[in-house]
Every structure is written in C-alpha cells, then in structure tokens.
Amino acid sequence: MNERLATAAWVVWTALRAEQQGMRTRPMVVVVSVVQPVALLAIVAGTRRLTADRASVVVSAVVLTAIWSATVWTAGGVLRRERTYGTLARSVTSQFSPSLVLFGRSLGATLSSTAGILASAAVVIVLLGLRVAVPHPLWLLVALLVVVASGTALGMLLACLFLVTRHGLAWSGALIYPVFILGGLLIPPDALPQWLRWVPTLLSLHWVHEFVVGLSSGAVRPAPLAVAVALTVVYLVAAVACLRVAVDTGRRRGSLELV
C-alpha cells in the first residue's frame, strides 16, 4: 500500500515538474499570469477610490477571473498540446495511470499560473496603494487551497473535453469571455438578467468569490466554500470518467487521435 502511494506521488510530482518546465517557453503563460491580471486590476481598481473591504472584493474577482483564463489556456490545453507534439499515446498508455499523469500536469500548470497571478496582483496593489481587508487570513489560505484544487480539477476536465475535438483551440478562446460576463466574478450575479443568474452557480470559482466577499466584511460563511469543494469533486470525477472513455475509444480504434 505504501509503495503504491509512493509510486503515485512520484508520478504526480514528475508530471508536475515536466509541465512547469514546459510552461517556461510558452508566451501565453506570461499573458494570462501577468499581463491579464495587471490590466484587469489596473482598470477595475485604478480608476476609483475603494474602501478596504471593497478592494478585497475587487481583487478577489480579478484574481479568480485571471485564474479561470489561465486554467483554460494552460491546464486545459495539456492533452491538446500532447496530441500536437505527438506524445499523447506515450502519456496515456504508459504503465502509470493516465489520470495520475493528467492530474500532475494540471496541478503543475495551476500552481505556476496561480503563483504568477498572485504575484502580479500584489505588485499592482502596492503600486496603486490599495488597502485590502484580510480579517481572517487562515480562512483566506483555505480558500486559496480550494482554488488550486478546483483549478486543477477544472483543468483536467477541460483538457479531456478539448481532447475529443479537433477544434480545442477554438473552444479555448470561446470559453473565456462568456465566463468573464456570466461567471459571477467581475459582474455580480444580481446584475445579470434573471434568466441567466443560475449560470454562476455551476462555477466553483464563483462560490470561492462569495466566500471571500463574506470574509472581507468579517463574516466566515463556510457554505459557499463547501459548494466549491463539492463542485471540485464533480469536476474531478467527470474528468477521470471522460479521460477513461477517450482513451478506451482511442484504443478500440487503434488510434489516439480520438476524432
């Protein structure tokens, strides 16, 4: 049992490091992890005076929006890039579980992009002189861990969905801005048309943002964070099932192009 856990941890760590090394050569990583959060935060927070609690809400919305974008373009593109480079079959048919490999790569992408986004946001906060309210730092750390877990699971799911179509790159671009508008982050759900207010409830990052909104006013409301965790589990289970179906289909056809 211990040997199997050690092997699984080694597989995840190796995949994580491989993905992080590959990210160093991709210009898109700089765009989604540095340029985008800096631009969004400068536009949203730099054009008006904000109270400390309101600044916390704005920073949370911008950071989570940037993490969504980074998830789509980095973790969400893991398997699509493998297919482009011709290494997909080796990644998903080795002696190790393809789910573990994908988890490690998605986790590596999520950690790197999240670190870049947080660092970029911190620089802008200092330059703009924003006062950010953090009344419960430990709970904020818990929320950050949920964000990393959720981004990893969501990245795995998107990677599997993008894999089963030759138009994954187009879908990546198409998914960005609808969530910017309908994700309940930059635009509050109550500002959306009544018939669209259910959309943000499907996004775990929206629930993390709701939790942070409560924290900024001094209230600890575990319910939104619990919903985010539940959605993360749903994303992960769906991703593993989707990957298994995709790989099995490729094996039956004798090809891992899958489409």
Region annotations inferred by a language model:
Residues M1-V259:
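Hydrophobic transmembrane alpha-helices and immediately adjacent juxtamembrane helices
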